């Protein structure tokens, strides 16, 4: 989160040896320049509805004083920074007894500084944060890391949550298609609500394309929690039905909408078991307990339904929304999964010296080719309307990002 109404990346465009903001994103070495940078950011926000963030991180989401610095040193520095920032906010944005909401993001780089560690106290309980909303964060993969304890749930500034449907970072990024099932969102965010996190919900969605459905659900859960939240367990199926009817109801039958639901829930469930970017040919065993065969059966059923729905809608001239929001994601996800499953069979039987390994190797190559064909089809669809959205790397990640990704 970027402090006091200025974007962190903006500093790189205005820094320099002759800049009034100095040439170091470092509060210790360049205190006056950083304060000037923040002050000017607040000044230009006067008259606008803002939710300024207090605090500071190092460059590129790193720790301020380095990985080996003491928690106590960082906490001491953050206390000074937060106090200075609040003074600026009060001076420029809170005139005439007006108050503005303020936010402190307890993201992974600053968690230790908030909660403390060992004998070192953190910012928890710091009086200058009393009227500040504390934004907690999931583990980057849609699971809660920390929630308010009983003694702090009446915190004056309230609590918020930063949730991920898309992530760029360690240990493995996932930025291709939707891979978070609704029931996981429901489980985690209703727990969040029950623990008193009700002031602010933020969702990191990356590109909206391919995330339309889970994003829509997240926003509706936040907006109408009484209908979809804690008092409505097992309601994600009903929500899915409603969304499909709202989106496709004018030109589909009830049976066809049921098929769409099977496709939508099916591919999200499979992607939720193992996100595509972190999938490899050893995840599902090619022989033990018929694990591979059971997954392949699910893939075949889902694939047939997906193709059937597309052909029906195409015959009516109504395939556009289905293709771009569901068909491509489901088809490409299933194809990738089959690619890895058959690659696993190829490697198993090759190690055993069995000739059938060659057959599975050829099948794997067919799925690789199909992956390329699906991407090109998406790029060409509707005269290139969504061209570029198909380019996200998604196969065989060997690092946290797409460097050195590889086909099986």
Where are each of the predicted segments found?
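Feature activates predominantly on carbohydrate-active enzymes
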Residues: 1-32, 46, 123-143, 150-181, ...
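Flexible loop/turn segments at secondary-structure boundaries
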Residues: 5, 11-17, 21, 59-65, ...
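Aromatic- and acidic-residue-enriched carbohydrate-binding clefts of CAZyme catalytic domains
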Residues: 3-73, 157-168, 233-241, 246, ...
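Substrate-binding cleft of secreted/luminal carbohydrate-active enzymes
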Residues: 181-264, 343
């Amino acid at each position: 989160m970027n402090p006091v109404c200025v974007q962190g990346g903006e500093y790189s465009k205005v820094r320099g040896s002759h800049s009034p903001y100095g040439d170091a994103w470092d509060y210790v070495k360049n205190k006056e320049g950083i304060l000037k940078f923040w002050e000017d950011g607040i000044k230009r926000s006067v008259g606008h509805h803002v939710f300024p963030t207090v605090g500071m991180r190092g460059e590129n989401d790193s720790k301020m004083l380095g990985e080996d610095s003491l928690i106590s040193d960082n906490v001491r520095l953050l206390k000074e920074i937060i106090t200075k920032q609040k003074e600026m906010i009060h001076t420029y944005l809170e005139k005439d007894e007006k108050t503005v909401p303020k936010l402190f993001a307890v993201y992974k780089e600053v968690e230790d500084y908030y909660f403390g560690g060992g004998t070192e106290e953190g910012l928890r309980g710091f009086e200058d944060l009393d009227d500040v909303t504390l934004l907690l964060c999931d583990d980057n993969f849609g699971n809660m890391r920390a929630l308010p304890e009983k003694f702090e749930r009446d915190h004056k500034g309230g609590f918020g949550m930063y949730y991920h449907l898309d992530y760029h970072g360690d240990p493995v990024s996932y930025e291709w298609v939707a891979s978070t099932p609704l029931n996981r969102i429901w489980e985690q965010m209703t727990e969040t609500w029950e623990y008193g996190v009700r002031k602010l919900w933020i969702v990191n969605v990356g590109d909206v394309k391919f995330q339309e459905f889970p994003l829509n659900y997240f926003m509706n859960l936040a907006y109408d929690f009484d209908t979809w939240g804690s008092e409505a367990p097992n309601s994600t199926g009903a929500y899915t039905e409603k969304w499909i009817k709202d989106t496709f109801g004018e030109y589909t039958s009830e049976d066809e909408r049921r098929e769409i639901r099977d496709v939508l829930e099916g591919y999200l469930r499979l992607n939720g078991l193992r996100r595509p970017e972190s999938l490899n040919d050893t995840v599902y065993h090619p022989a033990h307990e018929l694990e591979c065969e059971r997954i392949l059966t699910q893939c075949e059923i889902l694939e047939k339904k997906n193709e059937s729905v597309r052909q029906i809608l195409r015959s009516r001239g109504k395939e556009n929304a289905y293709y771009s929001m569901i068909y491509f994601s489901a088809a490409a996800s299933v194809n990738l999964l089959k690619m890895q499953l058959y690659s696993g069979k190829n490697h198993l039987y090759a190690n055993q010296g069995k000739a059938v390994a060659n057959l599975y190797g050829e099948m794997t190559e067919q799925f690789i080719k199909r992956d390329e064909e699906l991407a090109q089809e998406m790029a060409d669809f509707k005269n290139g309307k969504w061209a570029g959205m198909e380019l996200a790397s998604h196969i065989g990640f060997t690092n946290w990002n797409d460097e050195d990704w590889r086909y099986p």
